[in-house]
Every structure is written in structure tokens, then in C-alpha cells.
Amino acid sequence: YCFDSLPEKECFFQYIKSDKVQEVYFTEMFTSNQGDLSVYYYDPESGRIWQYYPDFLAKMKDGTYQLIEVKGDNKIDDVVVQAKKEAALEMAAASGIKYEMYAGSTIMKTHILESLPVQQTNLLP
């Protein structure tokens, strides 16, 4: 799998190393309509409906699911990103799934599932 960014890679490794997570699935790799996990959203800039593929889907050990998106700090407030987030939140709520959008800086500073600071020795190259 080719990660889009270091924070996305760090997020993935935090999820697979966590004892709270049973499995993690890549969803973004199915961007050529090969997978079923996508979110339709209204793009306020183009006025069109598009498909959005979140980064990961995690099955937690408590039986719940999390749909996960990692965004750079400079993009997280973008109107299109927010439109994707709103559509994903609506779809996730209707499906009983929790949607998480993480800022890259948050992932690099915090063990997101543990709410603990990341130690410099644990950062990925």
C-alpha cells in the first residue's frame, strides 16, 4: 500500500499496534470502483455529486467499526473536505459506524487511540 503521507502511515501503524483494534482495512485503494465502501457527497465548488473513499476502516475489539480519514492541517477546514466529512458522518451514523477525521499534526503528536503523547523514538521514518 502506498500511503499518501507520513501522518496517514503513522495512523495506520497506531491502529494495527493498538490492543483495541481487531482488524484494519484499506479503503482508499479501491478508488477505481473496485470496492463497495465509498461515500457520496455534494461538492459545493463544482455543484456535483462525487464519490469519496476514506482512508481506512477499522474493526474494533468491542465489535464496533471506525471509518478513518487523515488530513493535513492545511486541508482540514477546506470546504470540500468538510462536505466529505458531513456526508461521511451522516452515512456512518445511519450504519452504526463511528467516523473519525484526524489532523496530521494530532496523529504525529498523540497515540490517537490512547490519548497519550507520541515519543520521538516511536515516530516512523
Locate each region found by the language model.
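Electrostatic, structured charged patches in enzyme active sites and in nucleic-acid/phosphate-binding
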Residues: 1-125
